[in-house]
Swiss-Prot record:
BP GO terms, sorted: cellular response to oxidative stress
Glutaredoxin domain mapped to chain residues: 60-161
Protein name: Monothiol glutaredoxin-S10
Organism, scientific name: Oryza sativa subsp. japonica (Rice)
The organism's place on the tree of life at top rank: Eukaryota
InterPro entries recorded: Glutaredoxin (IPR002109), Glutaredoxin_euk/vir (IPR011899), Glutaredoxin_subgr (IPR014025), Thioredoxin-like_sf (IPR036249)
GO molecular function: 2 iron, 2 sulfur cluster binding; glutathione disulfide oxidoreductase activity; metal ion binding
Described purpose of this protein according to its UniProt entry: May only reduce GSH-thiol disulfides, but not protein disulfides.
Amino acid sequence: MPPRSLTLSRLPVAALGLPFSSCSPPPPRLRFPFAARRARSLATRASSSSPDSSFGSRMEDSVKRTLADNPVVIYSKSWCSYSMEVKALFKRIGVQPHVIELDQLGAQGPQLQKVLERLTGQSTVPNVFIGGKHIGGCTDTVKLHRKGELATMLSELDIDVNNS
């Protein structure tokens, strides 16, 4: 009997070694060293140029306004299972968060995600804020809910919660 070979389509997903802790696609890999140096050079110039940095600060101001105007904010991607889980949790407890779907913002989505990473240190979605305070992602939000701390945080903002 010939030895069995695994094709990629039959290979278990876990065997691919893909990280499932985030909903961010991996960064592209550059094949040639000179391309990597050029990309770093362009990134450095872009981050130091005034139009980009003023655009970034405008986006940062926009994020801060959104957080100030809404007691519960979720930065999400519509296709992300972790984002779906967090949105379903808030729905179960009867809370309507202000949801911003980064994947539906066109070119501004990835830029906004970079601004969020600068502000929070978290590069993945969902990015959950309560009362303007960053509480983390899906795992953090679910843990707070299980410990009863999520309901406490929401009640401090005069938000009624169904105990589900």
